[in-house]
C-alpha cells in the first residue's frame, strides 16, 4: 500500500506542516518537491505491485477540498469542482501507470481524504473518464463513523470494491456530541474504532453481501484499538 504517499499527491496548504513528516527528509518543507516525490513513489509502486503478482493496490487520494467539507462559510462557486478537476489531473498519469502494470488503484474511502464517501468517489471517477483502474477500498468502520449505510454501499459499488478491510467501530451520539466529535480524543469521541466484535459493524451482513457479489479479493483484518 501507499497510503502516506497517496496522501502527499494532493495536500491543501492548511495541512502542509501536518503531512510533511510523511515525506522523505530531502523534500520536506517544499510542497512541489514533496508532491513530485510522492508521484514517483506511486509509479514505482505500480511496478512493484506487478512484480509481486498483485492485482489491487491500496492508497489514499489526498485532499484539496477537505478544509471546505462543511458548507460554511458558503463555498465560492466552482471551488469543489476545481479541486476535483485538479485531483483527477494529478492522479490520471498514476492510474495510467497502474493500467500498464495490470493493477487496480483502490482508494480507501476515508475521512480527511477528498474521497470520503460514494459521491466523492464518483466525482473523481467521472473526471478520470471512468478510468478502469480507479477502484475502491471498502472499510465499514469509516462508514459507521459518518452514519453511512455500509450494506447498501456494497449493493451500489460492488463492481468497484477490490480491497476489503475488516475493521470494527461504534457510533454512540449523545446530547453533547455527534459525528464531529467535539475535538475530543479517540477514547472520548462518540464515534471510535473498536476491536473486531466489540463494535457495531454487521460483519455477517457484510460477508453475505460480499459472497452474493462474488468478491474476488482478500478480507484483510485491521486493528485500531481504543483502550477504554
Where do the language-model regions lie?
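Short, solvent-exposed beta-strand-terminating loops
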Residues: 1-13, 61-65, 166-178
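Active-site acidic/histidine proton-transfer and metal-coordination neighborhood
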Residues: 9-135
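Conserved small/polar residues in nucleotide/adenosyl-binding loops
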Residues: 226-228
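Acidic/histidine-rich catalytic cores of soluble enzymes
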Residues: 80-200
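Short amphipathic alpha-helices and their capping/turn segments at secondary-structure boundaries
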Residues: 41-56, 149-162, 204-212
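Short glycine/proline-rich, acidic loop/turn segments that cap or connect secondary-structure elements
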Residues: 181-184, 205-218
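Conserved beta-strand positions in the central sheet of alpha/beta enzyme cores
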Residues: 58, 162-165, 220
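Short acidic/histidine-rich active-site segments
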Residues: 218-224
